[in-house]
């Protein structure tokens, strides 16, 4: 018996499969769809925001592209403002659908970063100096975006000592003065506040904000949405005509019947009905 084999190796080769989308299959129909979508988003309707984790800078699935989020979103808020080339192209794509792209500047995240770095021994500056430097760095990234979400949760000043209250106000002044200066220089862009209005000390920023996003993504029933709104309105200078409530989507874990639910009901749909 004789055995034989091929003497040449056969190398595997990846093949790029590009399935045509509706924009290529029917350009005229897609153009009409975009026109109708843009007209709707420019009309008077309930505004829908969505947060998008764009931390993956070498995407390996369509789910990591802003251009593949649902067209129904009015605003995408990215978690990382440092963008790479494919993300800039994605922004152009979603703009064609009338979707805006914002990024968030979080006071509380900056505070946590400074605290952690001080503990690690990698940061020696005061928080005030660190806050100013970080704000300047983040504001410098604003060019590709349609707006900024200024996030401030903080602590309730009612329970602060006078010294702590003065320090909190000084830090708020630093934070919101940079935000306000940016808004003054960019009147065509949007400013949104996210956080607890009751924790602001002598700040007038809310009157300049297009929307106020309340921290409600962890409430457990729809009645608490009204409670959060009433608590926000108890603070001085809070406009009542621009609240946005937040709700979580359901978990990918099918056994999790808590995340994204108000009791047994979907939180997203119930929050939409409440608005």
Specify the residue positions occupied by each region the protein language model found.
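Hydrophobic faces of well-ordered beta-strands that scaffold small-molecule active sites
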Residues: 48-50, 74-78, 101-105, 148-150, ...
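Aromatic- and acid-rich polysaccharide-binding/catalytic face
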Residues: 76, 197-225
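Substrate-binding cleft of secreted/luminal carbohydrate-active enzymes
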Residues: 241-275
């Amino acid at each position: 018996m004789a055995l034989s084999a091929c003497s040449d190796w056969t190398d595997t080769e990846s093949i790029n499969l590009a399935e045509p989308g509706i924009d290529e299959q029917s350009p005229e129909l897609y153009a009409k769809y975009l026109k109708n979508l843009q007209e709707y988003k420019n009309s008077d309707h309930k505004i829908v925001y969505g947060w998008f984790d764009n931390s993956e800078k070498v995407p390996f699935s369509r789910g990591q592209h802003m251009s593949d989020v649902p067209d129904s979103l009015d605003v995408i808020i990215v978690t990382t403002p440092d963008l790479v080339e494919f993300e800039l192209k994605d922004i152009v794509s979603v703009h064609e659908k009338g979707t805006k792209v914002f990024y968030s500047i979080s006071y509380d995240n900056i505070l946590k970063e400074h605290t952690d770095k001080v503990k690690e021994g990698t940061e020696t500056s005061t928080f005030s100096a660190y806050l100013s430097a970080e704000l300047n760095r983040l504001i410098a990234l604003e060019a590709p975006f349609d707006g900024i979400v200024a996030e401030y949760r903080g602590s309730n000043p009612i329970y602060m000592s006078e010294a702590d209250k003065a320090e909190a106000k000084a830090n708020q002044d630093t934070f919101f003065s940079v935000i306000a200066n940016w808004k003054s220089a960019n009147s065509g862009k949007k400013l949104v506040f996210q956080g607890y209005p009751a924790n602001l000390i002598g700040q007038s920023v809310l009157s300049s904000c297009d929307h106020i996003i309340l921290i409600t993504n962890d409430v457990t029933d729809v009645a608490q949405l009204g409670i959060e709104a009433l608590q926000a309105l108890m603070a001085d200078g809070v406009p009542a005509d621009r609240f946005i409530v937040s709700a979580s989507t359901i978990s990918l874990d099918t056994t999790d019947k808590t995340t994204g639910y108000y009791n047994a009901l979907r939180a997203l749909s119930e929050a939409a009905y409440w608005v």
